[in-house]
Amino acid sequence: MYEIKQPFHSGYLQVSEIHQIYWEESGNPDGVPVIFLHGGPGAGASPECRGFFNPDVFRIVIIDQRGCGRSHPYACAEDNTTWDLVADIEKVREMLGIGKWLVFGGSWGSTLSLAYAQTHPERVKGLVLRGIFLCRPSETAWLNEAGGVSRIYPEQWQKFVAPIAENRRNRLIEAYHGLLFHQDEEVCLSAAKAWADWESYLIRFEPEGVDEDAYASLAIARLENHYFVNGGWLQGDKAILNNIGKIRHIPTVIVQGRYDLCTPMQSAWELSKAFPEAELRVVQAGHCAFDPPLADALVQAVEDILPRLL
């Protein structure tokens, strides 16, 4: 990965009556524009995310999506849908005077990248995607319902289901929704910590749990749950695989960890079958973008796609 340079431009953009989103630019002000779309939903971006891009070559734009990271209000699910986020990306592009850009996203960021590209294909130079997640019921059930990845970490699964009454464990995502949006803040925070702790075990091969406090877990837990309960607003004619025809001309590289427990390779495989023009690169790695095999593969993907953007 590249040296992490400080932003040369940053601020907040009012995108609705409620929401302000954080944005920043780093790298070369005259370089090839790229936007980094973080995962979650609700994870927020970190300075390390700049490191996937050569700062001498790229004008690196990073945003924190509604309700998370440095954006305000924190952990707010109101006026917070996939299509709100797509509109926000366009507002940032217009504000910065960028015509077209490379779009880079992993996990939920891959979902949002695809949704944005299918809505505004004329604004996308290329796509670099990692850990494909299409926000389908089968994928959210794999993560947060019994019988999926729960079979890999049964001991941690018991901790995840512990806050839920036994008679409600057949629909865990819905049951957690009631806790994460409960009027009692202590109930919300306890549920958020359990949700985020569970996910942390799926991201790395040697997980250590979530080391931040419960409040720091609230955005990712609440917003993930909010999006999962609503199917990501990507059903029917909005489903990503039903709209591949809109983006088949866009240069695309998919980087997928073979042993990814959060976003298993099945989704990347299905996307590559529907989108044969995209290049699928399978890495002997898990989910975390910063683990060396994946990080190296992502840096290489960006370098390889660059000539097709110029």
Swiss-Prot record:
EC number(s) given by UniProt: 3.4.11.5
Active site positions: 107, 260, 287
Keywords, comma-separated and alphabetical: Aminopeptidase, Cytoplasm, Hydrolase, Protease
Domain of life of the organism encoding this protein: Bacteria
Pfam families: Abhydrolase_1
Domain AB hydrolase-1 per the UniProt entry, residue ranges: 33-290
Compartments where located: Cytoplasm
Role according to the record: Hydrolyzes peptides having the structure Pro-Y-Z to yield free proline. Also hydrolyzes the dipeptide Pro-Gly.
GO annotation, biological process: proteolysis
Reaction catalyzed: Release of N-terminal proline from a peptide
NCBIfam families: pro_imino_pep_1 (TIGR01249)
GO cellular component: cytoplasm
Location (main, coarse): cytoplasm
Species this protein is from: Neisseria gonorrhoeae
Name recorded for this polypeptide: Proline iminopeptidase
Keyword Nucleotide-binding: no
GO molecular function: aminopeptidase activity
Family membership: Belongs to the peptidase S33 family.
